[in-house]
Amino acid sequence: MNLNEYQLDNDGNFDSGFIDNSMHSSNGINVYFRDLEKHLIGHINNADLVIGAVAWLTSDAILDALACVKNVQIVVQKEDFLRPDVYSRTNWKSKLRSKYDALKCDLTRYEFGNILSSASVASDPTIDAVRCVGNHNRDKVPAFPRMHNKFLIFANVQEIQNSFGHTHYKVTPYGVWTGSFNLTKNASMSLENALYITEPDIVDAYFKEYGQIAAMSEKLDWTTDWAAPQWRIGT
């Protein structure tokens, strides 16, 4: 059952029913309650760069849209099924990894303009399109620290060439998507909400927070249950 399509029984005496209360305001905030996946994909399609932190990323439709974006960098919660060396009796894990492998990030950490630019500056500057962070809940403890964010940031990327002929890129974030909506296969059938925010100070705050989460992230083939960042601040 899709809860977004549910209606109460009506005895016919009142001409009313459940409606979509989504709205667009003039102060840089849009509110969505229905068709969230469709709205999110629309924002993804317009971006040069999509970055963010989401607990889980398993929606085929969203992953297919992200595969068409020039640059993507998303941090997810550390889970056992993310590791390529973990055997799965079903093919969903290998399919998910192939979806992740289709995403690309040609930008270096130094071009993001947040704390990522200061992370292990003497090491390989590349960054994977999908990384993980947090603690692996091996014992399935209910109250366990997780990276439970659900936000994506949309940015323009400008190519700049200096007087020496060297090219670098300037990242300019312009919008944030956040709310209860998980980027998973079944979330579109649940009652969820999302905000799309373009107010510059709020966008910048999310951009800085993303940088901190990404700076403490690890590759998907993690080896330690507890958080084990690949980088440090400085060299």
Indicate where each model-derived feature is located.
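PLD/PLD-like phosphodiesterase catalytic module centered on the HKD motif
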Residues: M1-L49, W56-T235
